[in-house]
């Protein structure tokens, strides 16, 4: 009876039978052929969910409720289906309650199986979320729990991940002669892969910098390089660290196609001298009471993608009342609901205005980004590192 009352239909390949978001009440049983089930995601792309062949079925939810379709269903090859809509189901029930009861029972069985699969997916998602949370805590442990506190200086960090884990990172380490290593990096992409690479990057930079700097100090103490100045040691440490890091990544991890932008520096607190390397990173800005003084442009390419490249070392002296602000492109590229970016010009305009502290500057930029993005999902990690030399009265 079902075969005679239901509509039998034949479709060519490429015909859209169910449209995601449409409200329809037709249940399909595949007699011959195959269909593809897919779901629309961001930017007009589709994610393939399943391919159903003869004996498969779809659209059962639409037969019993009035909710939109959850996916698109398109014929993969010429396909023959039975189509059962709400009116057909009602006629079957009226003509033969037994067949109607059996059909309803089968549809309910399908729904029950879907509920079981959904519950299983929920449990798997919860397990994955727990693993991500563990990863977040481990990643958090790679970041310094507190920024260094130095007489006459203020060092502030801010990291706001776009997801559970982040591809951005920062670091600050005080050497035993009071000079300070400062690092800000941005790994390409987002998510777990970027987070793993972030951990590797941070570990390499810290380990190589500490090794090279302490090697210079031992040489000075042993009189092997008596003429070598502290400034030369700072510059050489930066250059050797980035060369070793880039070499290690390109030799051992080139197949990952992962790389990072990297700004890192060593600060000499007594004089305000800063030696730095900028590996393809957004140029940090030096700003003071009279606005922006300069930007610290790239001294070499991205790190981890091109072997055997060279990096120059830049230098600058921070005067009292000046702040050096480094930030990732998540700041300039923060987007609102209409996909309009916050923009570099807006950041520069904020930096022209003086602030009483590095913390106030970072908070003012953060507040401006929040006002711009409002309820839009965060598109990228947002990270800032601010170093301010206090005026004599504030030391």
Regions found by a protein language model. Give the residues of each.
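Regulatory nucleotide-sensing modules
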Residues: 1-45, 164
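A cytosolic small-molecule/anion-sensing beta-strand core signal
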Residues: 12-13, 31-32, 53, 77, ...
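… and, occasionally, acidic/histidine-rich disordered N-termini of signaling adaptors
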Residues: 22, 120-325, 374-395
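Short beta-strand His + acidic residue motifs that chelate non-heme Fe in jelly-roll/DSBH
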Residues: 37-38, 60, 71-75, 92, ...
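Ligand-binding loop in jelly-roll beta-barrel domains
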Residues: 64-87, 98
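A small-molecule sensor/coupling module
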Residues: 1, 69, 87-120, 231
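Short acidic-glycine-tyrosine-enriched beta hairpin
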Residues: 43-58, 318
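Short beta-strand segments in beta-sandwich/barrel cores
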Residues: 7, 16, 34-39, 57, ...
């Amino acid at each position: 009876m079902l075969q005679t009352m239901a509509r039998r239909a034949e479709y060519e390949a490429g015909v859209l039978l169910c449209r995601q978001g449409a409200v329809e009440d037709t249940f399909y049983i595949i007699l011959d052929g195959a269909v593809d089930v897919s779901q629309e995601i961001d930017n007009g792309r589709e994610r393939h969910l399943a391919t159903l062949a003869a004996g498969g079925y779809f659209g059962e939810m639409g037969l019993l409720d009035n909710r939109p379709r959850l996916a698109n269903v398109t014929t993969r090859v010429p396909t023959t289906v039975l189509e059962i809509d709400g009116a057909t189901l009602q006629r079957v029930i009226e003509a033969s309650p037994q067949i109607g009861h059996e059909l309803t029972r089968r549809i309910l069985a399908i729904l029950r199986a879907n509920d079981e699969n959904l519950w299983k997916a929920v449990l798997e998602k919860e397990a994955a979320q727990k693993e991500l949370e563990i990863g977040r805590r481990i990643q958090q442990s790679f970041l310094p729990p507190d920024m260094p506190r130095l007489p006459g200086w203020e060092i502030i960090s801010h990291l706001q991940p776009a997801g559970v884990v982040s591809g951005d990172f920062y670091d600050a380490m005080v050497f035993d002669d009071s000079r300070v290593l400062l690092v800000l990096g941005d790994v390409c992409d987002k998510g777990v892969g970027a987070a793993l690479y972030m951990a590797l990057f941070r570990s390499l930079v810290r380990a190589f910098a500490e090794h090279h700097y302490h090697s210079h100090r031992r040489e000075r103490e042993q009189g092997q390089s008596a003429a070598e100045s502290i400034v030369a040691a700072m510059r050489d440490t930066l250059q050797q660290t980035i060369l070793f890091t880039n070499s290690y990544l390109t030799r051992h991890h080139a197949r990952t196609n992962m790389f990072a932008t990297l700004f890192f520096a060593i600060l000499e607190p007594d004089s305000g001298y800063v030696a730095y390397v900028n590996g393809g990173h957004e140029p940090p800005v030096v700003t003071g009471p009279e606005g922006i003084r300069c930007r610290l442009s790239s001294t070499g390419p991205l790190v981890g993608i091109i072997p055997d490249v060279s990096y120059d070392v830049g230098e600058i002296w921070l005067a009292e009342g000046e702040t050096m602000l480094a930030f990732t492109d998540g700041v300039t590229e923060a987007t609102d609901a209409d996909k309009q970016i916050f923009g570099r010009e807006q950041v520069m305009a904020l930096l022209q205005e003086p602030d009483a502290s590095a913390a106030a500057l970072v908070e003012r930029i953060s507040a401006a980004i929040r006002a711009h993005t409002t309820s839009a999902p965060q598109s990228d990690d947002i990270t800032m590192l601010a170093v301010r030399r206090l005026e004599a009265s504030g030391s």
